[in-house]
């Protein structure tokens, strides 16, 4: 399968309106998670409601997926170095922090393609598109989820989905500090190095990458951002 040819059911000539939330301050993980849950519930109750996407940064924290193993934590979970959250996404442990862009699409996959595997591949392509715009070559590794540049993983992906409505999403390391990743085995992948885009492009900042991520999400999922009053 050529994932580069994956498309959604929605025509790019008729993009659907979606709300885009881009707070200018760091958003605690639990607040962003609550907002996604509320929007997911809104789509359950009002199926014709617009979809929504959050692009933001978190203060330092760690999250564990539904079935994630505590063996990938290199600290006592009762005394974590930063807040630790057990959440309703797939995947193992990951680290969020300033300098990392996260994108949380709350989409109704029945409006796109109701296939979680394809949705994960689309999120990877969102990141690969951004890297291409920056002149970097991103790639996926067989059997693994995420995006690598060279031997370094620069983007982690983990989603939750109920009744085909998604939450959680992707985390792209731009100019974040990497020390906190040493406290875990990121995504449960032993021997895989974590990287950040500024390692290849010194001086690159989140503000440089965020417009590209916004553009790639809109293009891949055929979304038109609804102006907010």
From Swiss-Prot:
Q: Which reaction does it catalyse?
A: octanoyl-[ACP] + L-lysyl-[protein] = N(6)-octanoyl-L-lysyl-[protein] + holo-[ACP] + H(+)
GO cellular component terms, alphabetically, are:
cytoplasm
Positions binding substrate in this chain are: 89-96, 156-158, 169-171
Cite the BPL/LPL catalytic domain residue spans from the record.
47-225
So where's the catalytic machinery, residue-wise? 187
**Which top class of enzyme applies to this chain?**
transferase
Q: Report the sequence similarity comment from the record.
A: Belongs to the LipB family.
What is the protein named?
Answer: Octanoyltransferase
Tell me the organism.
Synechococcus sp. (strain CC9902)
